[in-house]
Regions:
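Non-catalytic interaction-recognition regions
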Residues: 1-406
């Protein structure tokens, strides 16, 4: 989103959360079983429910907040109360985690609203008028095979309940009706394959060009420590939460490391490597370059150096090979931003930051910035100042801090 805004697009960030359907019901049933277990009232958890350690954490928090009285409610009322509480608590946790990450959304969109406002029924009627809906076996089907899908997709089940495809189609229609002409959907690895194919058919069913929507699929992240699978603190299971990683490595190391990989590449997150204070750690390497640049400029100011005005400076004096290499990297900034935006490839910016940092480190090793030649020192001063600005802009786009000191 930052890249699209930087290249002139008007962007709205939206988080779509699934608060309807079987997943929420399974969450509620799983927490309910764990809650009753804490009270010595064993209850069988659903076979297809959630089994992570966070379920036990939620149950413990629920009991601490609401006591034991929920156990005496009518089972249906208890399930509804616990389901609603569990969902709200999970959503609050997601918001808090994203805030720690420096990720902001303009809109939080509830799937439930599509059901409650009749948007799904309206979507079915719209598609029916377009001649791409068929009633079959008591269900309502979208004829996605007309648009390249392997098989038709149900919109409404035979029992009258909307399917996930029905909700997804309604959500797509809602966004288009709100005036958006380009839609980017970002999903997790569990949506690989069938969801993008199905949604491309939905786009075509509405008569929209293929490039109206893009479907970006992330990959799984494996967390390791010194090459071995890492068990994070607090958890007995085989998952590591983003909060676990943030507690250990911090926002900058987490964001930078994740953004070094293209979206379609599996990620191995080495906890020790990303926190190592050495130049073989990319985030440290880049931030150290910025701190060194700041130190050079600070020392110049403290020693009373005053550069010639930029218009008075003879930049033609920058003829050392390392100066030329640094200038070339600086000149590439705008192209890198545009290409990263067009290709939906933020990892281009982390690689660019590393290349720019490397070019500066080589320049610094071979070219004395503040010497006896005032004209040359002024030219090099402005080169360092330009490097500082471009590196700061690059880090700002990926929302990683640019430290003045390290």
């Amino acid at each position: 989103a930052n890249l699209l805004i930087a290249t002139g697009h008007k962007v709205e960030r939206e988080y779509y959360f699934n608060d309807a359907g079987s997943q929420i019901e399974q969450l509620g049933a799983s927490v309910e079983a764990a809650y009753l277990g804490l009270l010595g009232r064993p209850a069988e958890a659903p076979a297809d429910g959630y089994k992570g350690a966070y379920v036990a954490d939620l149950a413990t928090e629920l009991r601490a907040e609401q006591g034991d009285a929920l156990a005496d409610l009518d089972p249906e009322a208890r399930r509804a109360r616990i389901t609603d509480w569990s969902f709200r608590r999970m959503l609050a946790g997601i918001r808090q985690t994203l805030s720690r990450l420096g990720v902001e959304f303009d809109v939080w969109f509830s799937e439930r609203t599509l059901h409650e406002t009749g948007a799904i029924a309206e979507t079915v009627d719209d598609l029916r008028e377009r001649g791409v809906v068929e009633d079959r076996d008591g269900a309502v089907w979208l004829r996605t095979t007309l648009f390249g899908d392997a098989k038709d997709q149900p919109l409404i089940r035979s029992n009258g309940a909307p399917t996930s495809c029905g909700a997804d189609a309604a959500y797509y229609r809602d966004k288009r009706r709100r005036g958006f002409d380009r839609l980017l959907f970002l999903w997790g690895a569990d949506h690989h394959g069938y969801v993008p194919r199905r949604m491309r058919a939905v786009v075509r069913a509405f008569g929209d060009p293929d490039d109206t929507a893009e479907f970006l699929i992330g990959q799984l992240v494996s967390v390791v420590r010194a090459g071995q699978p890492a068990k994070m603190s607090r958890r007995a299971g085989d998952i590591a939460t983003v909060d676990d990683l943030l507690d250990e490595v911090g926002k900058d190391a987490f964001r930078y490391t994740m953004l070094r990989f293209s979206l379609d590449a599996p990620i191995e997150f080495d906890v020790e490597a990303v926190t190592r204070q050495s130049l073989d750690n990319p985030v440290y390497y880049v931030q150290y370059a910025f701190a060194r640049i700041s130190s050079v400029l600070r020392q110049g100011t403290e020693t009373g150096f005053t550069a010639l005005g930029v218009d008075e400076t003879d930049l033609g004096l920058l003829d050392h090979p390392m100066e030329a290499a640094l200038l070339r990297r600086l000149a590439a900034f705008e192209e890198q931003v545009v290409m990263a935006a067009v290709q939906r490839a933020p990892h281009r910016l982390t690689r660019y930051a590393e290349e720019l940092a490397a070019a500066f480190h080589r320049f610094y090793a071979e070219c004395r910035v503040l010497g006896d030649d005032h004209a040359l020192s002024s030219a090099r001063w402005w080169l360092v100042e330009a490097t500082r600005q471009v590196l700061a802009n690059t880090l700002a786009l990926i929302r990683v801090d640019a430290p003045e000191r390290m």
